[in-house]
């Protein structure tokens, strides 16, 4: 599907204009800031649109898009106005405009975000105008993708500076001078992206950290040994990695601190001042170029990359290394360095909340900008219908915005329906009755994979489905209503299982194995490297090592016996099942994004908090049309205090769609999908008949309560609503 757009009457093309934000608008009042909004007009066509008004700011953010039908000779005028003044007189409140002529439109479409300087409506106007507006023009087939590089200078009537964005996740205020993406002799970008060198007006020499942390931007690791241009470079200092962006720009990452830099750490900074003419010719396949500001960079046509470091300096370093050993190690980049070539990254923190924010940001960069992951199921057949629909989809489709609908119900999913779907689905797919999982022991109700699940011939496909559901929940910020064993989370992280992990799963076996390690077993035990287990009523034997039934356990080899026993206990008959589940999980959550977490943290990310802190709940509740001293509020909390843990969880599920609490607590409850921030639990006093039951709005975490006359009536109605009702509707 590569049609250029949707045409109307054969003479116009459909273009989606996105007005992202404006920067540094003129302040024309001494005591107050303007309320800016943008107006979009397709000149001569009658098409006119206005953005929302943003209050009291010189840097409004709109991020709104409009579909325009533009003819071959049409132009687009985008003007910014102060809503506080537009009613006073004609022309009042004008803050600047930009006009795109027809040739500018054809050249700017599908080139990413552009930052355009605002200008006066007429050159003779005396009012001061300043600032920029950030917009993009996309045809239908390119929405969500990047375009080719174009030279935008001279196309705009106001001749504003054009800034191109490298992708949807990169803010335009965080650009820096960087080596240009690799281009061949024709000037076409090798990476297929739309990022080229842009010189920031502030000359701020920093690159956005997210861009280098984005898994889509990281290129394969290139070592100097596999470069084909004939010269050998010294090894990188310990802790450094050489990486390449998708545009072919080489940078260096210090893995311990997370600091990135364009400067090659193998080259002392004083060598960069050497006269290029004194270094001799460039290696074969290399070319020297300069940025718009005159800074030199080097193009490697062999590897299709660009860099600031002169490749000839490696030859000097090799020669010096042959003459003498370095007297001191290379200096590591400092955490707070503000040198112009260093790319400061966020400090690595053990704080789980901070690491979770980084994970959420990385996942948001992978979410497609258009389309939905639509799932429609019935409550009666939720497991099988969800399985069939999820397994038909591609992983990239599952990353689109999640929209769930229960058949026969009219509820609109802005997050609440999806949370209830996951809650109900987990009760089915994790139920030991279905044979996929089992409890770790008879009296410990954490879940582990059932080694006898192969009784279902399609069990591997179902484990793949379970992995996808777990990944889907994490990707979209929801939680799985079920607890697995700690070793299960360690296996998901690729970490080895240890004897200490057995204590929480099988305390008796752990106690026995610890006794073996701590005591002399020679006169006591007569074991071999062969163990027995029960499978469908039959006693089967398993050799822990080849010919294990003939190898006795002694003081010398008992540590090996315990290690092999522990590994067998956790992986007995579940290797294929676990690999299928892990495959489904990693289709949505790449393995490298999980490296900063340990098993306890991963458990919280997947399952959230299962314990409800009543004080935290109370202190992070919003009241609407009532106050803390209102009878309804006091009676509500009195009722909650009388509930046991199970009923409190059911109440939370009734109002929010989930029994789980975010790891930050109730202050981080998520509301409607795509909301800018959390949405607190809300008690809303409504004017309604007191014979009605309380109503819940799961997308807004809100419960509507009529003005009941007594505590007893509120308790009865609330309990009935929580225990006896289900389903969604639209008011």
Curated annotation (Swiss-Prot):
<dbReference type="InterPro" id="IPR000008">
    <property type="entry name" value="C2_dom"/>
</dbReference>
<feature type="modified residue" description="Phosphoserine">
    <location>
        <position position="200"/>
    </location>
</feature>
<keyword id="KW-1003">Cell membrane</keyword>
<keyword id="KW-0677">Repeat</keyword>
<dbReference type="InterPro" id="IPR035983">
    <property type="entry name" value="Hect_E3_ubiquitin_ligase"/>
</dbReference>
<feature type="cross-link" description="Glycyl lysine isopeptide (Lys-Gly) (interchain with G-Cter in ubiquitin)">
    <location>
        <position position="355"/>
    </location>
</feature>
<dbReference type="InterPro" id="IPR001202">
    <property type="entry name" value="WW_dom"/>
</dbReference>
<dbReference type="InterPro" id="IPR050409">
    <property type="entry name" value="E3_ubiq-protein_ligase"/>
</dbReference>
<keyword id="KW-0221">Differentiation</keyword>
<dbReference type="GO" id="GO:0005886">
    <property type="term" value="C:plasma membrane"/>
</dbReference>
<feature type="domain" description="WW 2">
    <location>
        <begin position="280"/>
        <end position="313"/>
    </location>
</feature>
<comment type="function">
    <text>E3 ubiquitin-protein ligase that acts as a negative regulator of BMP signaling pathway. Mediates ubiquitination and degradation of SMAD1 and SMAD5, 2 receptor-regulated SMADs specific for the BMP pathway. Promotes ubiquitination and subsequent proteasomal degradation of TRAF family members and RHOA. Promotes ubiquitination and subsequent proteasomal degradation of MAVS. Acts as an antagonist of TGF-beta signaling by ubiquitinating TGFBR1 and targeting it for degradation. Plays a role in dendrite formation by melanocytes.</text>
</comment>
<protein>
    <recommendedName>
        <fullName>E3 ubiquitin-protein ligase SMURF1</fullName>
        <ecNumber>2.3.2.26</ecNumber>
    </recommendedName>
</protein>
<dbReference type="GO" id="GO:0005829">
    <property type="term" value="C:cytosol"/>
</dbReference>
<dbReference type="GO" id="GO:0061734">
    <property type="term" value="P:type 2 mitophagy"/>
</dbReference>
<dbReference type="GO" id="GO:0030509">
    <property type="term" value="P:BMP signaling pathway"/>
</dbReference>
<dbReference type="Pfam" id="PF00397">
    <property type="entry name" value="WW"/>
</dbReference>
<keyword id="KW-0832">Ubl conjugation</keyword>
<dbReference type="InterPro" id="IPR035892">
    <property type="entry name" value="C2_domain_sf"/>
</dbReference>
<dbReference type="GO" id="GO:0016567">
    <property type="term" value="P:protein ubiquitination"/>
</dbReference>
<feature type="cross-link" description="Glycyl lysine isopeptide (Lys-Gly) (interchain with G-Cter in ubiquitin)">
    <location>
        <position position="357"/>
    </location>
</feature>
<feature type="domain" description="HECT">
    <location>
        <begin position="394"/>
        <end position="731"/>
    </location>
</feature>
<dbReference type="InterPro" id="IPR036020">
    <property type="entry name" value="WW_dom_sf"/>
</dbReference>
<dbReference type="GO" id="GO:0051607">
    <property type="term" value="P:defense response to virus"/>
</dbReference>
<keyword id="KW-0808">Transferase</keyword>
<dbReference type="GO" id="GO:0030512">
    <property type="term" value="P:negative regulation of transforming growth factor beta receptor signaling pathway"/>
</dbReference>
<dbReference type="GO" id="GO:0005737">
    <property type="term" value="C:cytoplasm"/>
</dbReference>
<dbReference type="GO" id="GO:0000209">
    <property type="term" value="P:protein polyubiquitination"/>
</dbReference>
<dbReference type="GO" id="GO:0030154">
    <property type="term" value="P:cell differentiation"/>
</dbReference>
<dbReference type="GO" id="GO:0061630">
    <property type="term" value="F:ubiquitin protein ligase activity"/>
</dbReference>
<dbReference type="InterPro" id="IPR000569">
    <property type="entry name" value="HECT_dom"/>
</dbReference>
<comment type="subunit">
    <text>Interacts with TRAF4. Interacts (via HECT domain) with FBXL15 (via LRR repeats). Interacts with SMAD7 and TGFBR1; SMAD7 recruits SMURF1 to TGFBR1 and regulates TGF-beta receptor degradation. Interacts with MAVS; the interaction is mediated by NDFIP1.</text>
</comment>
<dbReference type="GO" id="GO:0030279">
    <property type="term" value="P:negative regulation of ossification"/>
</dbReference>
<dbReference type="Pfam" id="PF00632">
    <property type="entry name" value="HECT"/>
</dbReference>
<feature type="region of interest" description="Disordered">
    <location>
        <begin position="216"/>
        <end position="237"/>
    </location>
</feature>
<dbReference type="Pfam" id="PF00168">
    <property type="entry name" value="C2"/>
</dbReference>
<keyword id="KW-0833">Ubl conjugation pathway</keyword>
<dbReference type="GO" id="GO:0070534">
    <property type="term" value="P:protein K63-linked ubiquitination"/>
</dbReference>
<keyword id="KW-0597">Phosphoprotein</keyword>
<comment type="pathway">
    <text>Protein modification; protein ubiquitination.</text>
</comment>
<feature type="active site" description="Glycyl thioester intermediate">
    <location>
        <position position="699"/>
    </location>
</feature>
<dbReference type="InterPro" id="IPR024928">
    <property type="entry name" value="E3_ub_ligase_SMURF1"/>
</dbReference>
């Amino acid at each position: 599907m590569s049609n250029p757009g949707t045409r109307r009457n054969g003479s116009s093309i459909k273009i989606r204009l996105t007005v992202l934000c404006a920067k540094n608008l003129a302040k024309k009042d001494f005591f107050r800031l303007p309320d800016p909004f943008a107006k979009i007009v397709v000149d001569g066509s009658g098409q006119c649109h206005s953005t929302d008004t943003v209050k009291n700011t010189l840097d409004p953010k709109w991020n709104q898009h409009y579909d325009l039908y533009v003819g071959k000779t049409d132009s687009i005028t985008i003007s910014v106005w102060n809503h506080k003044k537009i009613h006073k007189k004609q022309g009042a409140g004008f803050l600047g405009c930009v006009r795109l002529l027809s040739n500018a439109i054809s050249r700017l479409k599908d080139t990413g975000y552009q930052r355009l300087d605002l200008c006066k409506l007429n050159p003779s106007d005396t009012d001061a105008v300043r600032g920029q507006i950030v917009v993009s023009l996309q045809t239908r087939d390119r929405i969500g993708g990047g375009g080719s590089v174009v030279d935008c200078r001279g196309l705009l009537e106001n001749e504003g500076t054009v800034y191109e964005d490298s992708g949807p996740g990169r803010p335009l205020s965080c650009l820096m001078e960087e080596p240009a993406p690799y281009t061949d002799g024709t000037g076409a970008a090798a990476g297929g992206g739309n990022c080229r060198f842009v010189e920031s007006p502030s000359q701020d020499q920093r690159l956005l950290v997210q861009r280098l942390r984005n898994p889509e931007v990281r290129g394969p690791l290139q070592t100097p040994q596999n470069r084909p241009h004939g010269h050998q470079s010294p090894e990188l200092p310990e802790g450094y990695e050489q990486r390449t962006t998708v545009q072919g720009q080489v940078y260096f990452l210090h893995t311990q601190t997370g600091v990135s830099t364009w400067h090659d750490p193998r080259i002392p900074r004083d060598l960069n001042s050497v006269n290029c003419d004194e270094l001799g010719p460039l290696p074969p396949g290399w070319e020297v170029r300069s940025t718009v500001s005159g800074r030199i960079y080097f193009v490697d046509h062999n590897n299709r990359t660009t860099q600031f470091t002169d490749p000839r300096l490696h030859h000097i370093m090799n020669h010096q290394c042959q003459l003498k050993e370095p007297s001191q190690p290379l200096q590591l980049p400092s955490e707070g360095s503000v040198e112009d070539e260093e790319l400061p990254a966020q400090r690595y923190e053990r704080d789980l909340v901070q690491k979770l924010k980084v994970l959420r940001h990385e996942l948001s960069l992978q979410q497609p900008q258009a389309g939905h992951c639509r799932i429609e199921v019935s409550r009666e057949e939720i497991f099988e219908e969800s399985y069939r629909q999820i397994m038909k989809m591609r992983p990239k489709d599952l990353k689109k915005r999640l929209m769930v609908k229960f058949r026969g119900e009219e509820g609109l999913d802005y997050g609440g329906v999806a949370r209830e779907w996951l809650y109900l689905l987990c009760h089915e797919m994790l139920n030991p009755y279905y044979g996929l999982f089992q409890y770790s022991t008879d009296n410990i109700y954490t879940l582990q994979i059932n080694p006898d699940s192969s009784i279902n011939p399609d069990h591997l496909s179902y484990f793949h489905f379970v992995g996808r559901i777990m990944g889907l929940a994490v990707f979209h910020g929801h939680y799985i209503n079920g607890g697995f064993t700690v070793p299960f989370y360690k296996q998901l992280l690729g970490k080895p299982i240890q004897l200490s992990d057995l204590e929480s799963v099988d305390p008796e076996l752990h106690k026995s194995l610890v006794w073996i390690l701590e005591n002399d077993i020679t006169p006591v035990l007569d074991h071999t490297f062969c163990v027995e287990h029960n499978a469908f009523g039959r006693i089967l034997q398993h050799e822990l090592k080849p010919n294990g039934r003939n190898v006795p356990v002694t003081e010398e080899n008992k540590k090996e016996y315990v290690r092999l026993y522990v590994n067998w206990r956790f992986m007995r008959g579940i290797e294929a099942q676990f690999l299928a589940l892990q495959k489904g999980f990693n289709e949505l959550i790449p393995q490298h994004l999980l490296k900063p977490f340990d098993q306890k943290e991963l458990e919280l990310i997947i399952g959230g908090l299962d314990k409800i802190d009543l004080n935290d709940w109370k202190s992070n509740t919003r009241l609407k049309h009532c106050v803390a001293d209102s009878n309804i509020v006091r009676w509500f909390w009195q009722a909650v205090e009388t509930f046991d843990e199970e009923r409190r969880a059911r109440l939370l599920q009734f109002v929010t769609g989930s029994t789980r609490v975010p790891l930050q607590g109730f202050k981080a409850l998520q509301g409607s999908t795509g909301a800018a921030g959390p949405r607190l639990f809300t008690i809303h006093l409504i004017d309604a008949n007191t014979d009605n039951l309380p109503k819940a709005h799961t997308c807004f975490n809100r419960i509507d309560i009529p003005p009941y006359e007594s505590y007893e009536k509120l308790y009865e109605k609330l309990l009935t609503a929580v225990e006896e009702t289900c389903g969604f509707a639209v008011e």
